[in-house]
Amino acid sequence: MNEYLVSRRRLLRLSLSLLPLGLGRPALAQSLFMPQRVITLFQGATDTAVALGITPAGVVDSWSEKPMYRYLRQALAGVPHVGLETQPSLEDIVLLKPDAIVASRFRHQRLEPLLSQIAPVVMLDEIYQFKKTVQVMGQALQRQAVADQLLQNWQLRVNGLREQLQRKFGGDWPPTVSILDIREDHIRSYLPGSFPGSVLSELGFGWSDASRAQPGVSLKLTNKESIPVVDADIFFIFLRSESPSVQRNYESLIRHPLWQQLRAPRRNQVWVVNGVTWSLSGGILGANMMLDDIARVTGIAGGVS
C-alpha cells in the first residue's frame, strides 16, 4: 500500500485519539463562542459562509468551474480545499484544526461521529433550503444579526420583484414555469421543492399539475418524447456544461417537432440562465443572483435592488 496513504491514515487515527472525548457534543448555538476556523462541506454552506462575512478555513471542491465557482473565487482566494462534497478528506480536515464544521445530513450523516470528534458540527437536514441554512449557520456561528439582515434584504427583494412581475404579466399572471437542465444524455426538470424551484415559487410563479405531483427535487427525462410532461408558459433553461455533447443535445432538443408545439417556445419565452447560479450554488448569494437573472430575462427595467 502507498506509504503516503498509510501515514495519512495513521495521522488521522492519532489526531482523533488525542482529541477530547465529546468535543462535538455541545451545540454551538448554546455557547457564546464565535468560531474562527469554520470548514464548510457542501456548496450552499460555502456560499452562506461568504454571505455571513466568514472566510472558511476549508471548503469542498465545487461541482463545476473547478476548483471553485467563479462568483466565489475572489472571496475564497487561498482557502484550502478538503476534497469532494460527497467524499471530504478527514485527514485534511484534521490538519486544518477547525473549531466548527458545517455539514449536511443528506451527504455526511455517516461521517458525523468522526467529524464531531474533530470539531463541533453544524448539521443541516437539507442542502436545498437556503434560507434555513442562513438561519442555522447564523445562529450556530454567532452571526445572528448578519443572518437576520440577509433574510430581511432577501424578502424585500422578492416582494419588489414579485410586484414588478405582476405588473409586467398583467392578466397572464402567474404564468407556469419549468426549469430545464440540459445534460449529455438526458434532460432534468427541477421541481417546486428544488433550490431554484423554491425561489420561483416564492416569487409567485405557477407550476403544472405534473410538476406539483412529482416527489423529490427533479425529474429525469430520458427521451425527448417525454418533454410535453414539463410543458409550461415559461422555460428557464441552462446547459450543465460547455461540452460539445451537451450542446448537441440542446440543439437536437430545440429542433425536435414536439419542442415546437410547447407553449414556451411558441410564445418565445425560453430564457437561458446561468447553470451554476440556478442549480449548483445552493446558497443565498446564488439565490440573489437568480433574482438578477429573472429580472434580466423578463426585461424588468433597472433590475431589482
Swiss-Prot record:
The cross-references to InterPro entries, in alphabetical order and at most eight, read:
ABC_transptr_periplasmic_BD, Bact_iron-sidero_bind
Q: Where is the signal peptide?
A: 1-29
What keywords are assigned to this protein?
A: Ion transport, Iron, Iron transport, Periplasm, Signal, Transport
What are its GO cellular component terms?
A: outer membrane-bounded periplasmic space
- Per the database record, which ranges form the Fe/B12 periplasmic-binding domain? 37-302
Coiled coil regions in record: none
| PANTHER family referenced in this protein's UniProt entry, alphabetically | IRON III DICITRATE-BINDING PERIPLASMIC PROTEIN, SIDEROPHORE-BINDING LIPOPROTEIN YFIY-RELATED
The family classification in the record reads: Belongs to the bacterial solute-binding protein 8 family.
What does the UniProt function comment say about this protein? Binds citrate- or chloride-dependent Fe(3+); part of the binding-protein-dependent transport system CbrABCD for uptake of the siderophore achromobactin.
This protein is called Achromobactin-binding periplasmic protein
**Organism for this UniProt entry:** Dickeya dadantii (strain 3937) (Erwinia chrysanthemi (strain 3937))
Q: What is the lineage of its organism?
A: Bacteria, Pseudomonadati, Pseudomonadota, Gammaproteobacteria, Enterobacterales
